[in-house]
Design a protein with these regions (language model features):
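Glycan-processing catalytic domains of CAZymes
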Residues: 1, 5-211
Length: 211
């Protein structure tokens, strides 16, 4: 499987739908399945999306689609996007494309751009991520794209993180107090069990649902 990221955005990127079609057609001709990353508002062709209906044709060429949600909402504003996911899934099923909604644990520009550009979405000790995971599953998702395993630049990493900074003064931010170093990996693992029908979905956002 190959993933082609960020097609259809309206921010004047150096590539467009024409280039994406060429790449996807080439991959499909060689037997690859293709996942296409698209903007949040891909279905309505508004907001972060260019108003070109050819994007929908491009999506139909692919096996899986994944809308980019990082930075679009926080735990308070998420419910509107859960409804968006539900409607996206209906479109995807009608058009015979698999749909992988994106979830992310939190966000910060602090590492990449410095404190002066520190747009921040709190993790809330995993509550934000768990709300998205269970929300996507309730909306009908059969697969989920987690952003990201090791993305430090935008503060979305879910990998194990120390609870104490092992050096002197540093911009490194340790994992939140009161959670284990692999807390976010556990949350994702629990969601995977639910997707595989190995356990029922938990109707709450308590920490460490495995506990």
């Amino acid at each position: 499987e190959m993933c082609i990221r960020d097609s259809g955005f309206n921010d004047n990127r150096r590539y467009g739908l024409k280039e994406a079609v060429h790449i996807i057609d080439g991959l499909k001709s060689q037997g690859f399945s293709v996942m296409l990353g698209v903007p949040t508002q891909w279905r309505a062709l508004e907001g972060d999306t260019e108003s070109d209906p050819r994007l929908h044709e491009l999506i139909r060429k692919c096996d899986i689609m994944m809308p980019w949600f990082v930075g679009r909402y926080n735990e308070t504003t998420y419910p509107k996007y859960q409804k968006l996911v539900e409607e996206d899934i209906q479109w995807a099923k009608k058009n015979q494309v698999d749909y992988a909604p994106l979830v992310f644990p939190g966000f910060s520009w602090g590492n990449l751009k410095g404190k002066d550009h520190n747009s921040f979405i709190p993790r809330n000790k995993g509550s934000f991520l768990w709300t998205q995971l269970t929300g996507a599953i309730r909306a009908g998702a059969e697969m989920i794209y987690v952003a990201m395993f090791d993305e430090i630049d935008e503060g979305t990493a879910i990998f194990k993180c120390a609870q104490k900074v092992p050096v002197g003064k540093s911009t490194f931010v340790p994992i939140e107090e009161g959670v284990e170093s692999d807390h976010y990996l556990k949350l994702v693992g629990e969601a995977a069990k639910i997707l595989r029908k190995e356990k029922a979905i938990a109707y709450n956002t308590k920490l460490n649902p495995a506990g």
